[in-house]
């Protein structure tokens, strides 16, 4: 467990890397990998079709590939990366949390949420998190390691398969939104997260064919990485986990603020919004008597007025051993009104999954 305020930007050394997987590679790299084991390059396209378009991982499902080639291709490009430990469901089965065991025994979680008009999946980019926010169960656990691009992508592939196969009530469906708001700080695992976004949005069968506009990447505010992300030219939405409008409080709630202050973080976010043409999302967990004073709402509104932003207020979700709790309804209402008075769009998030520890800030990947 990290010490209060301690930050970890780099994953521990000596951690064994996951096996290479189709989803780690570009289409050109897949052809090279297939050729390296003596197979025709077009087999790479066939494998991509099975994985990204049909969600078919088992060699016996690849009927267009000779039986004698299947096992070699599986070993080279579709090794087993992760297995399901369990699913937990709530909301009549329309919210489902999955606990995954990775190849090395590491545990991570993802959450699928089906609404009447959309299906959203919250995915993890790291096992644990090094940002050490004291109100977040993931942050309090520390960082185990980064996930590979394929380990990130496979969470979505399995979610899409589950929706197609009717495992989630409501009939067959397709994912409409992906949010990098599960375990980890996405921009601290920059290259693999960017690789995952490319796999998710590459046209089928090279990728999953999802829209960049349906993807949200959340960050506590790693300013150099935000600038770098701006240069990628993505149309994803960027969400900044702000949680306080003043440096004095944010230094405590979001320890990375000791490196990059509120105005630096917001300016980097505004730059991304201008380049991408997407509104910046401001995430703010309301904590009773800590950051929910109306004057802080007023200060936040002043910082954001006239900017292309949307404020997402999150009633604090309980975590084991936490001394904090959600705001009183009257304080929440006054906070909303203080922000809205500056013409800044603000909503309170419809929190799901709290009963199964699947809501924002609750993912701890425990086998208990």
Curated annotation (Swiss-Prot):
Cofactor needs: [4Fe-4S] cluster
PROSITE patterns found in the cross-reference section: RADICAL_SAM
UniProt catalytic activity: adenosine(2503) in 23S rRNA + 2 reduced [2Fe-2S]-[ferredoxin] + 2 S-adenosyl-L-methionine = 2-methyladenosine(2503) in 23S rRNA + 5'-deoxyadenosine + L-methionine + 2 oxidized [2Fe-2S]-[ferredoxin] + S-adenosyl-L-homocysteine; adenosine(37) in tRNA + 2 reduced [2Fe-2S]-[ferredoxin] + 2 S-adenosyl-L-methionine = 2-methyladenosine(37) in tRNA + 5'-deoxyadenosine + L-methionine + 2 oxidized [2Fe-2S]-[ferredoxin] + S-adenosyl-L-homocysteine
Keyword list, A-Z: 4Fe-4S, Cytoplasm, Disulfide bond, Iron, Iron-sulfur, Metal-binding, Methyltransferase, rRNA processing, S-adenosyl-L-methionine, Transferase, tRNA processing
Keyword Signal: no
A Pfam entry, by short name: Radical_SAM
Binding site for [4Fe-4S] cluster: 129, 133, 136
GO biological process: rRNA base methylation; tRNA methylation
Principal location: cytoplasm
EC number: 2.1.1.192
Record-annotated active site: 109, 360
An annotated GO cellular component: cytoplasm
SUPFAM superfamilies associated with the record: Radical SAM enzymes (SSF102114)
InterPro entries for the chain: Aldolase_TIM, Methyltransferase_A, RNA_MTrfase_RlmN, rRNA_lsu_MTrfase_RlmN/Cfr, rSAM
TM region positions: none
UniProt GO molecular function: 4 iron, 4 sulfur cluster binding; metal ion binding; rRNA (adenine(2503)-C2-)-methyltransferase activity; rRNA binding; tRNA (adenine(37)-C2)-methyltransferase activity; tRNA binding
Residue pairs linked by disulfide bridges in the UniProt entry: 122-360
Co-factor remark: Binds 1 [4Fe-4S] cluster. The cluster is coordinated with 3 cysteines and an exchangeable S-adenosyl-L-methionine.
Keyword rRNA processing listed: yes
Residues of the Radical SAM core domain: 115-355
HAMAP family reported for this sequence: RNA_methyltr_RlmN (MF_01849)
Note: Reaction proceeds by a ping-pong mechanism involving intermediate methylation of a conserved cysteine residue.
Record family assignment: Belongs to the radical SAM superfamily. RlmN family.
PANTHER family the UniProt entry points to: 23S RRNA METHYLTRANSFERASE, RADICAL SAM CORE DOMAIN-CONTAINING PROTEIN
Name under which the protein is recorded: Probable dual-specificity RNA methyltransferase RlmN
Organism lineage string: Bacteria, Bacillati, Actinomycetota, Actinomycetes, Kitasatosporales
Gene expressing this chain: rlmN
């Amino acid at each position: 467990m990290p010490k209060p305020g301690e930050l970890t930007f780099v994953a521990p050394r000596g951690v064994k890397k996951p096996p290479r997987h189709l989803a780690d590679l570009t289409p050109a790299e897949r052809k090279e990998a297939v050729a390296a084991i003596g197979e025709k390059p077009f087999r790479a396209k066939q494998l991509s079709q099975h994985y990204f378009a049909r969600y078919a991982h088992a060699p016996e499902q690849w009927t267009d590939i000779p039986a004698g080639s299947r096992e070699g291709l599986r070993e080279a490009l579709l090794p087993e990366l992760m297995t399901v430990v369990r699913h937990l469901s709530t909301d009549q089965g329309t919210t489902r949390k999955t606990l995954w065991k990775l190849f090395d025994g590491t545990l991570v979680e993802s959450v699928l949420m089906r609404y009447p008009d959309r299906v959203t999946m919250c995915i993890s980019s790291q096992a644990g998190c090094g940002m050490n926010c004291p109100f977040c169960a993931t942050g309090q656990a520390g960082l185990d390691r980064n996930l590979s691009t394929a380990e990130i992508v496979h969470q979505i592939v399995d979610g899409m398969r589950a929706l197609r196969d009717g495992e989630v009530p409501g009939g067959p469906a397709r994912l409409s939104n992906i949010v990098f708001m599960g375990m980890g700080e996405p921009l601290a695992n920059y290259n693999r997260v960017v690789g995952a976004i490319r796999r998710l949005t590459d046209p089928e069968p090279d990728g999953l064919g999802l829209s960049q506009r349906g993807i949200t990447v959340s960050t506590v505010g790693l300013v150099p990485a935000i600038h770098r992300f701006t240069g990628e030219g993505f149309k994803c939405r960027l969400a900044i986990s702000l949680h306080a409008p003043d440096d004095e409080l944010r230094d405590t709630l979001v320890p990375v603020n000791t490196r990059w202050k509120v105005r630096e973080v917001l300016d980097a976010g505004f730059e991304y919004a201008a380049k991408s043409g997407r509104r910046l999302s401001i995430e703010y967990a309301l904590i009773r008597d800590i950051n929910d004073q109306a004057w802080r709402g007023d200060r936040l509104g002043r910082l954001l007025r006239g900017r292309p932003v949307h404020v997402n207020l999150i009633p604090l979700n309980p975590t084991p051993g936490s001394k904090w709790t959600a705001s009183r309804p009257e304080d929440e209402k006054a906070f909303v009104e203080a922000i809205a008075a500056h013409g800044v769009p603000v909503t309170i998030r419809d929190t799901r999954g709290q009963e199964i520890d699947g809501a924002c800030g609750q993912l701890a990947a425990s086998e208990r």
